[in-house]
Amino acid sequence: MKVLFIADPMASFKTYKDTTYAMMREMAKRGWRLFHTLSGELSVKNGLVVADASAFEFLGAQDDHDKNWFAAADKVQTALKAFDAVIMRTDPPFDMQYLYATQLLTLAEQQGAKVFNSGQAMRDFNEKLAILNFSRFTAPTLVTTRSADVRAFLKEHGDIIIKPLDGMGGMGIFRLTEKDPNIGSILETLMQLDSRTIMAQRYIPEIVHGDKRILIIGGEVVPYALARIPQNGETRGNLAAGGRGVAQELSERDREIAETLAPELKRRGILLAGLDVIGSNLTEVNVTSPTGFQEIMKQKGFDVAAMFADAVAEWSVR
């Protein structure tokens, strides 16, 4: 198989924990031909969606800081439909450039490319707003552009979390209580004087035990979750915010949530998704670049990357 990864520069990968690296390593073991491009290197020429793609040989990292784990050839402009699979792994934020990239990916799919996750799925399934489709699994939630609404929500619940709809890695997330002296300045900053839509949720105290990332691949639930434990004094468990990842078996509630969402995600053409769960509450559905493969493999011995590669092979011929 020929597989194109649309991802951040490979020299920037933290190979000891990077999920895209784990995907590439597994596919290289299978003898698949691997290519890399940046989202900014997508374009349309003579009606075809093309990428400045470089074939690369997977050499493997010798230590955690090895930047020479690959050997890349010169870039060649290649139509996306020439690959057996195109894997979109560019991190958010989901800004206008990201939106344009998904639109080009949708056009490429119309031309015969197999893209995972599909451009339409990434556009339609906002990672924060997606939980509103499954409200029986969520804590009380507000979506608004009005700071007055947030103040009323805070008065009702006493302790809330507010966050932007386009962030990642815990960026822009604040915890507010009624006694917080900085409510006004936080709302002004995050909501940009009532011009930016945000989400507010009742604070879930179980966050002190971490939030859990539950992976769904090809409509099947990975049997282990990655609990992300916040640092002392933090309310964010995100690994990018300094959280510590601990792999653990799914609880009955975890499995109920995941098995309810899995068929809907599959129906929408979402090959890989990461559900974020705090306590018994679904808080996010990540469809852009879910992580956690390496931590689960190292701690539990379950080969998530192999499960993913199997799904790519199956879905690419559908």
From Swiss-Prot:
Cofactor: binding comment: Binds 1 Mg(2+) or Mn(2+) ion per subunit.
Cofactor: Mg(2+); Mn(2+)
UniProt-annotated binding residues for ATP: 154-210
Any one Gene Ontology molecular-function term assigned to this protein's record: glutathione synthase activity
PANTHER family noted in UniProt: GLUTATHIONE SYNTHETASE, RIBOSOMAL PROTEIN S6 MODIFICATION PROTEIN
Family per similarity comment: Belongs to the prokaryotic GSH synthase family.
Protein name: Glutathione synthetase
Gene name in the database record: gshB
